[in-house]
C-alpha cells in the first residue's frame, strides 16, 4: 500500500484509544529561535536546542524548525481537521531522530526519522502575548525569501496547549518529501484575528506576470485515508464541539453519516469536478451547523 499522504481529516469515532500512548516529555526550555524566514509559501523559524521524548517515541527527537499555516479567513487555515472541523491556523513543529541519524537530511530518508507536532490556532477575542513575539518579527521578512535573526526572547513552551492528549498516525511531511509520524494536539491555542491577519500581509514569490502577491493562504487540503491507515489517541476519545451527534437520536446519526459521505465526495472530486465538490462541501457546512444546534438543544434537555 502507498504511504498515507498528509494532512488528513481525523474521524474521532474511528480513532483507537490506546492507553500505551503515554504523555510526551517535552523539553523546550533550552530551545532558542535563531532565524525566521519567509519562504514565499510559509513562515519558518529555525531552532537550536529542545527535544521531545517519552510517549511512543523510541528515543529523543530534536526540534529543528516550526512552520506556520493560515487561510484567507479566520475560520479555515489548518492543514489537519478534526471531524471536519477546521481551525484558524496550524503550527507544525518538526523534529528529527538525532540519536540514530547524523542530520535532518539523513533522518528524512527513514520512516523513523521525522516526528511532527501539530498545534492548532483558534481565533478568539484576546491577543496571545506569546504568539505576538512571532508576529512582531514579520515586518523583517515581508518579502519572499527574506530571512532575519529572531531578535526576541521566546519560549516555545508557552505555545503548547493546555491539554497534551494527542492523536497520532503515520503520514508524510506536508510537502510529501519524507515519511513522518504525526502528533496532533486537538486542543487549540487562542490568538486574535489581528495577529493572524498580519501573516496575510507577507509577500510570496512572483506570479507569472512577475508581480509579487500576498500569501493570503497556505494551508493544504486533507487527503483521503488509505484503507490501512490507523489513527490512535492517547486519552479517551473526544468529539469536536461542532460535530457531536447524539447517538441516541437516529435522525442525528443519519445526518452525521450523510455529512461524512458529502465530505468523502468532496475529497474525491476536488481535483476533478470542482462544481460538485463545492456543492458537497456546502452540504457539509450546513449539516455541521444543524448537528451542532441539535446537540446543543439535546444537552439543554438533559440538564433540565
From Swiss-Prot:
Keywords: Disulfide bond, Membrane, Virion
Keyword Disulfide bond: yes
Any Pfam family matching the protein: Carb_anhydrase
Cellular compartments annotated: Virion membrane
Molecular function via GO: carbonate dehydratase activity; zinc ion binding
Subunit: Homodimer; disulfide-linked.
Name under which the protein is recorded: Cell surface-binding protein OPG105
Organism expressing this protein natively: Monkeypox virus
Amino acid at each position: 500500500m502507498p504511504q498515507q499522504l498528509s494532512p488528513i481529516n481525523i474521524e474521532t469515532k474511528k480513532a483507537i484509544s490506546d492507553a500505551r500512548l503515554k504523555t510526551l516529555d517535552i523539553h523546550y526550555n533550552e530551545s532558542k529561535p535563531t532565524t525566521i524566514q519567509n519562504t514565499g509559501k510559509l513562515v519558518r523559524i529555525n531552532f537550536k536546542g529542545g527535544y521531545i521524548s517519552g510517549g511512543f517515541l523510541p528515543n529523543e527527537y530534536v526540534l529543528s524548525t516550526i512552520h506556520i499555516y493560515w487561510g484567507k479567513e479566520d475560520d479555515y487555515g489548518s492543514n489537519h481537521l478534526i471531524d471536519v472541523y477546521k481551525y484558524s491556523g496550524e503550527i507544525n513543529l518538526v523534529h528529527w531522530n538525532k540519536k540514530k541519524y547524523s542530520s535532518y537530511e539523513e533522518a528524512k530518508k527513514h520512516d523513523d526519522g521525522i516526528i511532527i507536532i501539530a498545534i492548532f490556532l483558534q481565533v478568539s477575542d484576546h491577543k496571545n502575548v506569546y504568539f505576538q513575539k512571532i508576529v512582531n518579527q514579520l515586518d523583517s521578512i515581508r518579502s519572499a525569501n527574506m530571512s532575519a535573526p529572531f531578535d526576541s526572547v521566546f519560549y516555545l513552551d508557552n505555545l503548547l496547549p493546555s491539554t497534551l492528549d494527542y492523536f497520532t498516525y503515520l503520514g508524510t511531511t506536508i510537502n510529501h518529501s519524507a515519511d513522518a509520524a504525526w502528533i496532533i494536539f486537538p486542543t487549540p491555542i487562542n490568538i486574535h484575528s489581528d495577529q493572524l491577519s498580519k501573516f496575510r500581509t507577507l509577500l510570496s514569490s512572483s506570479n507569472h506576470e512577475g508581480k509579487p502577491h500576498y500569501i493570503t493562504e497556505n494551508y493544504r487540503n486533507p487527503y483521503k485515508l488509505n484503507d490501512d491507515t490507523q489513527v490512535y489517541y492517547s486519552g479517551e476519545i473526544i468529539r469536536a464541539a461542532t460535530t457531536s451527534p447524539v447517538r441516541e437520536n437516529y435522525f442525528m446519526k443519519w445526518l452525521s453519516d450523510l455529512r461524512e459521505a458529502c465530505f468523502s465526495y468532496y475529497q474525491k472530486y476536488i481535483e476533478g469536478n470542482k462544481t460538485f465538490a463545492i456543492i458537497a462541501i456546502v452540504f457539509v457546512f450546513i449539516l455541521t451547523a444543524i448537528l451542532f444546534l441539535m446537540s446543543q438543544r439535546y444537552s439543554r434537555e438533559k440538564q433540565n
